[in-house]
């Protein structure tokens, strides 16, 4: 999921990321359920040939419905479920804070549930996503898309923003860039000059 997302030439990297990260979580959670509750715990009681869904695994492992980690997974799962029918490039700006938190949550739970340190497999600096610097512009979305699609994008963004205001890094990791002008070169992180 991380490798796919960080390739700039791939068009549907947001949708691809959601598919692969959900698959990784599903396998990890089912493995944990087998380890902690036995093999039968990942099968439906009325259909022992069929394994439970990711939604079921999430609710069995993370029982607190208000847990920011669970809310994070549920939002990414919603994206995975609609991304085959509803793809927009603006979703990157909406979901990337959730994706980054999801990666760190996955790393934490792999260690807690399976004693596997993902930073031994993937160097820690590669657990960071390459993100677009472009901000989501509501007026641009309304102008670009039909009303139904624009409303959907802005509604999803509003719901995620509302949950993000709780400032819990298990739900989302806010990515902000601030630029300040200073005359003190020791405080500067980059330099600009006026060229005539």
PLM features: residue spans?
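Charged/polar positions within long, soluble alpha-helices
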Residues: 3-6, 29-34, 81, 85-89, ...
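Long, charge-rich C-terminal accessory regions
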Residues: 127-196
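Short, hydrophobic, well-ordered secondary-structure elements
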Residues: 2, 14-34
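Amphipathic, Lys/Arg-enriched alpha-helical patches that create a basic surface
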Residues: 95-146
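Charged alpha-helical initiation segments
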Residues: 1-17, 43, 126, 131
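A broadly used, surface-exposed interaction patch
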Residues: 31-96
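Generic structural signal for well-ordered, non-transmembrane alpha-helical segments
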Residues: 22, 26, 74, 81, ...
């Amino acid at each position: 999921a991380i490798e796919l997302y960080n390739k700039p030439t791939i068009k549907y990297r947001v949708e691809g990321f959601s598919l692969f990260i959900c698959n990784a979580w599903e396998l990890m959670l089912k493995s944990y359920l087998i380890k902690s509750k036995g093999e039968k715990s990942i099968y439906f009681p009325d259909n022992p040939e069929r394994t439970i869904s990711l939604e079921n695994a999430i609710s069995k492992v993370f029982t607190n419905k208000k847990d920011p980690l669970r809310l994070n997974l549920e939002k990414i799962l919603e994206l995975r479920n609609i991304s085959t029918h509803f793809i927009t490039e603006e979703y990157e700006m909406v979901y990337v804070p959730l994706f980054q938190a999801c990666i760190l949550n996955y790393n934490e739970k792999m260690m807690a549930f399976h004693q596997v340190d993902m930073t031994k497999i993937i160097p820690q600096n590669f657990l960071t996503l390459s993100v677009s610097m472009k901000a989501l512009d509501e007026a641009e979305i309304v102008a670009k898309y039909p009303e139904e699609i624009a409303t959907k994008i802005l509604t999803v963004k509003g719901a995620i923003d509302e949950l993000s205001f709780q400032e819990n890094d298990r739900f989302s990791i806010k990515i902000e860039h601030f630029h300040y002008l200073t005359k003190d070169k020791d405080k500067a992180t980059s330099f600009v000059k006026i060229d005539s």
